[in-house]
């Protein structure tokens, strides 16, 4: 029943709730009490509007839009409205909304289809329930100053302080009833440590994303009740792979081994590849406490010195982990390949393995480079390792020929000592050992995805859609501006055209910067129940099957696969799992996004901490981004900082948004330029680093910026002088 439609069609507006419920009851025969509950729900979600006289109208008919508010620390904000560009909300029109709140907004002025100004009419829901901040004892009251300075200070009563001490970082649960009052209250639920200490600051970031290391008692009880050994009764109806030469290949510090491999040569120069994945679903039963907590977490979160696991260690490091010398339950994909690594056939089975060796990427790399000691140590699997290398190279060539976009971007690696001090930040590239595992897992994921697509069974796919046409055009213009010829198709339909560009810039000094520029033009990969292909891999069918210890989508599709293997009719699977895969896809995409943001912010904090040692020192860097307020420069170790506009030479600059360039009469800055910079400041609270150009004093004469977008010059937008502040780069990742 569509209540909003009934109200509109029968002109039942401006009635109070009792009168409206009675009128609707006469029309529908539904009880007045039930209708009042439904009306209240529609008021709470913003579909209906309750005015000061307690009369009800339809929000959309009044020109009100549902929106999520994003605030800037200066007080103004933006409303994200479906189907419209973001509304600009001036500070005077925020009307009690906080960052992240769901609101009703209305338009107050419209300069163009792209420039809309609005105001908050009503806050529907405050979405911030917990905050992280610094506890300060005052003479008359104790307060917490949130790390997020877009939020107000929080009053903490003595009984709600958990005996926090002055200048300690705390995690606070907000009193939601006080959110619309002049004084927001809360209670301390956890003391995180003394402010400005690395451990407390990292924990503060983790809590700000509502990430918790500990598992609840019910989940732990379930995990601890599971035997750490595989019972012989569990072998039933499983294929026995214990005689295979099975190995795992992981990092030196890894404890959770969820994939293992074995190989043998077959007729006509082909290969039989066995990829064994931990059968986590055998232990994490559907709707158990373990399952619900894994669903909530969605993924394991990895920091340089810490992991927040999706599953308790009793499973992730215990009976689910494919440890050396132990029998383990697996879900296996057996793939027959011809000599060119075309798939001849494959099958998916429940199995049991006994891992012969726990090997590391470093060991595999050294073996491939001819380390005789390691070759002798692993003599029983040496031929297999060479076989994996053959397969990987052939698979890599096949993916290249179909147009896979391969970006070899070095990742910053933060090295810390035992006391948590950051020793160095280095760039690390993926070596051949990593490529072997990557190639085998991609092949496995593709085989599994195609199987269940063809069967038309509900599934969770990993999709990467083609780039937005506007981003493709912008990228093409920027590359041409930097002298990189390209034939990018504006519809973004051919991944091979991207790969040609990447190959053309190989070996150039700005290769990494340009590759990152290409990456930023891409869509974000996500989970969905609809198979939309994977643009980056140039793959028609793709899923995540190979990491069920650390990713919920993998665990869920294991469960679906096992139900199918055990004979559950496809129609039954459709009825049961269609809604489940839809919810899980959305949830897992969100939890992955949260994990990525938390990992990035912790890394940014540690980079800022590390660079405090180098204040005043000179470095050579590459321009990695250009905005009207300044230029971003990336150092050789991957640390990025901002040279603000007032620290550029005095000039009249024109900023071109389409090519991301700042052009002056005498100076010109674009992505890929090499510059010498001085570390001017490293702000650990804001997680940002400021650079200055070597030999350039702060600009006291002023620099004009005439903003240019889509090749249409706009009026001068701002002038930098001694007294004006440049824009913050706090949200640089979202802007660029």
Where does each model-flagged region fall?
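Charge-lined substrate channels and their catalytic hotspots, especially those that engage the 3′ end
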Residues: 1-274, 281-327, 358, 365, ...
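Electropositive polyanion-binding surfaces
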Residues: 22, 166, 171, 176-178, ...
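Acidic/polar residues at beta-strand termini and the immediately following turn/coil
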Residues: 51, 146, 338, 416-417, ...
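A short macromolecule-binding patch
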Residues: 86-90, 151-156, 639-655, 701-705
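Internal insertion modules embedded within essential enzymes
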Residues: 133, 181, 671, 680-695
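Short beta-strand-to-coil "C-cap" segments at the C-terminal boundary of structured domains/repeats
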Residues: 192, 692-699
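Short beta-alpha connecting loops at secondary-structure transitions
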Residues: 537-540, 544, 654-664
């Amino acid at each position: 029943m569509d209540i909003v439609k009934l109200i509109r069609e029968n002109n039942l507006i401006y009635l109070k709730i009792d009168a409206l419920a009675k009128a609707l009851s006469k029309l529908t025969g539904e009880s007045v009490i039930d209708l009042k509950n439904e009306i209240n729900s529609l008021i709470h979600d913003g579909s209906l509007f309750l005015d000061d006289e307690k009369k009800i109208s339809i929000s959309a008919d009044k020109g009100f839009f549902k929106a999520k508010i994003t605030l800037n620390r200066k007080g103004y904000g933006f409303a994200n409205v479906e189907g419209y560009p973001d509304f600009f909300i001036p500070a005077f029109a925020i009307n009690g909304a906080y960052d992240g709140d769901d609101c009703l907004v209305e338009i107050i002025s419209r300069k163009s289809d792209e420039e809309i100004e609005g105001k908050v009419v009503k806050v529907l829901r405050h979405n911030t329930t917990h905050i992280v901040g610094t506890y300060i004892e005052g003479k008359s009251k104790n307060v917490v100053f949130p790390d997020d300075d877009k939020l107000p200070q929080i009053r903490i009563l003595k009984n709600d302080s958990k005996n926090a001490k002055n200048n300690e970082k705390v995690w606070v649960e907000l009193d939601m009833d006080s959110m619309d009052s002049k004084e927001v209250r809360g209670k301390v639920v956890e003391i995180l440590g003394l402010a400005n200490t690395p451990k407390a600051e990292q924990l503060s970031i983790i809590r700000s994303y509502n990430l918790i290391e500990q598992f609840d008692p019910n989940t732990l009880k379930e995990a601890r009740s599971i035997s750490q050994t595989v019972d012989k009764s569990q072998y039933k109806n499983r294929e026995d792979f214990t005689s295979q030469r099975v190995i795992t290949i992981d990092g030196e510090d890894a404890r959770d081994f969820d994939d293992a491999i074995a190989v043998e040569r077959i007729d006509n120069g082909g290969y039989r590849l066995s990829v064994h994945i931990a059968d986590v679903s055998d232990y994490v039963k559907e709707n158990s406490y373990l399952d619900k907590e894994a669903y909530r977490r969605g993924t394991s979160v990895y920091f340089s010195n810490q992991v927040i696991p999706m599953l308790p260690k009793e499973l992730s490091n215990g009976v689910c982990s494919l440890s050396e010398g132990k029998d383990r339950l697996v879900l296996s994909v057996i793939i027959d390949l011809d000599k060119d690594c075309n798939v001849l056939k494959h099958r998916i089975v429940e199995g049991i393995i006994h891992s012969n060796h726990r090997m590391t990427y470093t060991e595999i790399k050294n073996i491939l480079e001819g380390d005789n000691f390691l070759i002798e140590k692993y003599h029983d699997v040496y031929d297999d390792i060479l076989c994996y290398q053959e397969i990987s190279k052939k698979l890599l060539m096949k993916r290249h020929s179909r147009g896979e976009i391969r970006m070899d971007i070095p990742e910053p690696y933060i090295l810390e000592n035992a006391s948590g001090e950051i020793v160095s930040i280095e760039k690390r590239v993926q070596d051949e050992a990593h490529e072997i595992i990557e190639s085998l897992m991609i092949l496995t994921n593709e085989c599994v995805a195609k199987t269940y697509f063809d069967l038309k069974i509900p599934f969770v796919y990993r999709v990467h859609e083609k780039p937005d046409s506007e981003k493709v055009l912008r990228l093409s213009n920027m590359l041409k501006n930097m002298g990189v010829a390209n034939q990018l198709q504006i519809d973004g339909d051919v991944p091979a055209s991207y790969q040609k560009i990447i190959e053309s810039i190989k070996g150039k000094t700005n290769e990494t910067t340009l590759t990152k520029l290409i990456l930023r033009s891409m869509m974000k990969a996500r989970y969905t129940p609809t198979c939309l292909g994977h643009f980056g891999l140039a793959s028609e069918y793709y899923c995540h099957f190979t990491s069920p210890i650390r990713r919920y989508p993998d665990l869920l599709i294991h469960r679906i696969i096992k139900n199918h293997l055990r004979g559950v009719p496809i129609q039954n699977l459709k009825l049961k799992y269609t809604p489940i895969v839809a919810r899980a896809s959305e949830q897992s995409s969100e939890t992955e996004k949260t994990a990525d943001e938390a990992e990035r912010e912790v890394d940014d904090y540690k980079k800022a901490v590390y660079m405090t040692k180098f204040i005043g020192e000179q470095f050579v860097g590459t321009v990695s981004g250009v905005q009207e307020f300044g230029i971003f420069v990336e150092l050789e170790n991957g640390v990025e900082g901002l040279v603000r506009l007032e620290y550029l030479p005095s000039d009249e600059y024109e900023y071109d948004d389409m090519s991301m360039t700042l052009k002056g009469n005498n100076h010109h800055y674009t992505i890929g330029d090499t510059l010498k910079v001085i570390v001017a400041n490293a702000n650990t609270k804001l997680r940002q680093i400021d650079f200055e150009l070597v030999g350039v004093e702060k600009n006291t004469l002023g620099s004009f910026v005439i903003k240019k977008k889509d090749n249409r010059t706009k009026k001068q937008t701002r002038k930098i002088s001694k007294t004006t502040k440049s824009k913050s780069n706090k949200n640089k990742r979202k802007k660029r």
